[in-house]
């Protein structure tokens, strides 16, 4: 079986409406919308694949989408980015996912209001299974647990590394731990480690997660506060690049795509983190999850300026 360096993603994809507001309103309050941009797609795995493709990686998505206008727009975004969607199935009568995102212009923070799809689980046909089995890495986000677990099982049986964006959590914590254990590359958000392990500190929780399964990478992203990385059995803090963030929507998703791109190219852990942090920082300079994703040349120029 020929193995490629392709990043195959199974996870959430949606269409975002980015609303920049004067200030985030209190409950039962109001605020003015300064601008609306509904041209960009979103979703953790989806945006990671777009970022990787923009950086030159070979990428493909396995997903279900509704046979609706929203699904058309989501697919158009992938086509523009160069992400293969040959294994995306359109579901007649299905509703594709969309999301309203409020952005605070003072600090670039975002609050999401997802409108979930009503789509059935993915049917992992022979074609889809083969795509995973030949991948350089499988990237998951766990939003749809059944889809993520099925894909992870296919990858593990074929010896394909599993990358998990550990941000979504199931109510049954045993399910979270099962998926986390299957991940070879585990990159969490700031909340996930303590939430699923019950450990008192983030560092202790990350070490516990790193000990589950056969981890090659265990990281926690902290936004402007950098990254925690397990290195030789100890937690190391790696600072972020300082930028004036316009919008942090998709910053973590982009980090994943950039990290996997660098990792599949054979770079060491610190180089992968530094590259991903640079790409993520540049993304934050423009509104939306994708408009600010840099090209490889732009990312390398930024790194050269901050060496």
Residue ranges and their predicted role:
Residues 1-64, 69-76, 80, 244-245:
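Glycine-rich phosphate/adenosyl-contacting loop at the front of the ribokinase-like
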Residues 1-8, 33, 202-307:
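Conserved phosphate-binding/catalytic region of the ribokinase-like
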Residues 79-93:
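A glycine-rich helix N-cap at a beta->alpha junction
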Residues 90-91, 101-137, 142:
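Conserved phosphate-binding/catalytic loop of the ribokinase/pfkB sugar-kinase fold
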Residues 119-127, 146-147, 165-174:
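Active-site glycine-rich loop that binds ribose-phosphate moieties when present
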Residues 154-163, 168-237:
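Conserved phosphate/ATP/ADP-binding segment of small-molecule kinases
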